[in-house]
Amino acid sequence: MKILSSLKSAKTRHKDCQVVRRRGKVYVINKTNPRFKARQR
């Protein structure tokens, strides 16, 4: 999982990426290709 300051590029890397808020943190998750997971500080 990458930790990024901005998720703008992370959410457009793959068509199945989706932005989710969990416990006050913003995540990009990808069910089909978990390589593209990312988190914002």
Swiss-Prot record:
Organism field: Hydrogenovibrio crunogenus (strain DSM 25203 / XCL-2)
SUPFAM superfamilies xrefs: Ribosomal protein L36 (SSF57840)
BP-aspect Gene Ontology terms: translation
Entry-linked Pfam families: Ribosomal_L36
Keywords for this protein: Ribonucleoprotein, Ribosomal protein
This protein's GO CC annotations: ribonucleoprotein complex; ribosome
GO molecular function, one term: structural constituent of ribosome
Family listed: Belongs to the bacterial ribosomal protein bL36 family.
UniProt-listed PANTHER family: 50S RIBOSOMAL PROTEIN L36 2, LARGE RIBOSOMAL SUBUNIT PROTEIN BL36B
The keyword Cell division belongs to this UniProt entry's keyword annotation: no
Protein name: Large ribosomal subunit protein bL36
